Amino acid sequence: MTSNSKHNQGVIQRLRRRLSSLIPRVERNAVFEVLRRDTLNLPPRSPDLRIDQVTADNLQDISQFRNETVLQTFRQYLARKDIGVYAYCDGLAAGHAWAALWHGSKRLVWGYLPVDASTACIYFCSVSPSYRGRKTYQNMLVELSKLVFESTPVRRILISCALDNLPSYSAIERVGFRRLLILPILRWRGHMIRFARIPKVESDNQKVPRS
């Protein structure tokens, strides 16, 4: 490829990014919940899979498959006392998941999931491509949810995924989360419009119907 061709290709890519930023983008996200009184379904776990809580002592382990930027982000999560777990496969950190907790001020995860004194939200979950298909994600969701319910007074945990992300959608339902609603979102030039709101946590004698 000539230098002119490379230059032209770069110009085209920049124009595409610019045009893309000007076009409103519509997302459809499935929002799920699990309540303190619900039963979580722990999936089978292979002998080489271990789930540990993230602490100052093992925080650095995530460098085995994530970069320095992610490590620094996790330092911030730990400093603000969010709860995280690492999945270890064959002795190596190969997955992570975090739960956002309320610390006295209003907080939204992803701009639409509310965190308050009664509700936590699971976010920033990932599994190394080399270790997918081993129910790693499902095991992390269950262990993290148990940690949150055991160590905080929250009554509900929320999690969301794109409606077309079938592997995540299926994994979330299999461990015991139920779908609360489908949330359409319009994003445009840094702004976000939600077309529905997350219901407040139900009382112990009230049922929320599936959407």
Named regions from a protein language model:
Residues L163-L181:
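Conserved active-site alpha-helix within GNAT-family acetyltransferase domains
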Residues V148-C161:
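Conserved GNAT acetyl-CoA-binding A-motif
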Residues R80-K81, Y88-A120, F124:
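Conserved acyl-donor/pantetheine-binding loop and adjacent beta-alpha core of acyl/acetyltransferases
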Residues Q64-L92:
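Extracellular-facing segments of soluble proteins and assemblies that are Gly/Ser/Thr-biased and enriched
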Residues F32-E33, R178-M192:
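Conserved catalytic-core motifs of GNAT/GCN5-like acyltransferases
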